[in-house]
């Protein structure tokens, strides 16, 4: 199958390189657009009852550091049809919205082989709603 626009769900971790390399190989083979998608789910909302005066500054610093890693990753990709989307929202809804807006026909995402992921994989909520193909790349936990 020929893909025209490949979306890659990235988290800002080292594993992103594996996902990007897989997607880049497919993009080159299909002469497809490549969109790296990062969903910022808002760490500050995890503990709504707790607030420290420096919380916003710390969260902004963490976000800037994470965003810089993502920009650097995108800049190092040797493919002219590459872009980065960083959106604030919840998984999987925001990811599905971006996939639809970008008209992606393939989503590349990763999966850790852990006990909790076997019980509740993050992609479970996407499968029945996704109109694009889904490539799940296993991460080997060390």
Curated annotation (Swiss-Prot):
Q: Which GO terms describe its molecular function?
A: protein homodimerization activity
Task: Output the InterPro entries linked to this UniProt entry.
Answer: Rossmann-like_a/b/a_fold (IPR014729), Universal_stress_UspA (IPR006015), UspA (IPR006016)
Record Pfam families: Usp
Top-rank taxon, per record: Bacteria
The induction annotation reads:
During growth inhibition caused by the exhaustion of any of a variety of nutrients (carbon, nitrogen, phosphate, sulfate, required amino acid) or by the presence of a variety of toxic agents. Positively regulated by guanosine 3',5'-bisphosphate (ppGpp) and by a RecA/FtsK-dependent regulatory pathway.
Q: Which Gene3D superfamilies match?
A: HUPs
Q: Does the keyword Glycosyltransferase apply?
A: no
Which residues, by range, are in coiled-coil regions?
none
- Compartment(s): Cytoplasm
Query: An example Gene Ontology cellular component term from the record?
Result: cytosol
Keywords, comma-separated and alphabetical: Cytoplasm
What biological processes does GO assign it?
response to starvation; response to stress; response to superoxide; response to UV
Question: Which pairs of positions does the record mark as disulfide bonds?
Answer: none
| Entry keyword Cytoplasm | yes
Q: What does this protein do?
A: Required for resistance to DNA-damaging agents.
Q: Which protein family is named in the record?
A: Belongs to the universal stress protein A family.
Give the protein's recorded name. Answer: Universal stress protein D
Species annotation: Escherichia coli (strain K12)
User: What lineage does UniProt assign to this protein's organism?
Assistant: Bacteria, Pseudomonadati, Pseudomonadota, Gammaproteobacteria, Enterobacterales
Question: In the UniProt record, what gene is named as encoding this protein?
Answer: uspD
């Amino acid at each position: 199958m020929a893909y025209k626009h490949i979306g890659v769900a990235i988290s800002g971790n080292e594993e992103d390189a594996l996902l990007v390399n897989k997607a880049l190989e497919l993009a080159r083979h299909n002469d497809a657009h490549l969109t790296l998608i990062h969903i910022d789910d808002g760490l500050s909302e995890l503990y709504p009852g707790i607030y420290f005066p420096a919380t916003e500054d710390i969260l902004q610093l963490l976000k800037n550091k994470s965003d810089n890693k993502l920009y650097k990753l995108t800049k190092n990709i040797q493919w002219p049809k590459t872009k980065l989307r960083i959106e604030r929202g919840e998984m999987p809804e925001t990811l599905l919205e971006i996939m639809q807006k970008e008209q992606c026909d393939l989503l590349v995402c990763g999966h850790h082989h852990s006990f909790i992921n076997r019980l509740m994989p993050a992609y479970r909520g996407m499968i029945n709603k996704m109109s694009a193909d889904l490539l799940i790349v296993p991460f080997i936990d060390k």
